[in-house]
From Swiss-Prot:
HAMAP family in the record: PPV_E7 (MF_04004)
Annotated domain remarks: The E7 terminal domain is an intrinsically disordered domain, whose flexibility and conformational transitions confer target adaptability to the oncoprotein. It allows adaptation to a variety of protein targets and exposes the PEST degradation sequence that regulates its turnover in the cell.
Subcellular location: Host cytoplasm; Host nucleus
Homology family: Belongs to the papillomaviridae E7 protein family.
Subunit and interaction comment: Homodimer. Homooligomer. Interacts with host RB1; this interaction induces dissociation of RB1-E2F1 complex thereby disrupting RB1 activity. Interacts with host EP300; this interaction represses EP300 transcriptional activity. Interacts with protein E2; this interaction inhibits E7 oncogenic activity. Interacts with host TMEM173/STING; this interaction impairs the ability of TMEM173/STING to sense cytosolic DNA and promote the production of type I interferon (IFN-alpha and IFN-beta).
Motif (LXCXE motif): 24-28
Gene: E7
Organism: Human papillomavirus 17
This protein's name: Protein E7
Length: 95
């Protein structure tokens, strides 16, 4: 810069000296241990006690389910799906 005031060419020259190209490619390699894998949801054992839809006897089921899975099962058993005990199943088979 020559003189007391900066001129446009002086400013542009200074900016070009500050700007440096940046390599945006990442050449880092991850080991197999570091690669992210989706963890399978944890399955927890649940005991379900529900009545037979015909005679009312208690039926016991043990299931392995995720939190979302057991909620879905609960909705089904309280709604559209009903359980039948072995004795009532035999009666249904013969009718």
């Amino acid at each position: 810069m020559i003189g007391k005031e900066a001129t446009i060419p002086d400013i542009v020259l200074e900016l070009q000296q500050l700007v440096q190209p940046t390599d945006l490619h990442c050449y880092e390699e991850l080991s197999e241990e570091e690669t992210e894998t989706e963890e399978e949801p944890r399955r927890i054992p649940y005991k379900i006690v529900a009545p037979c839809c015909f005679c009312g006897s208690k039926l016991r089921l043990i299931v392995l389910a995720t939190h979302a899975g057991i909620r879905s099962q609960e909705e089904l058993l309280l709604g559209e799906v009903q359980l039948v005990c072995p004795n009532c199943r035999e009666k249904l088979r013969h009718d």
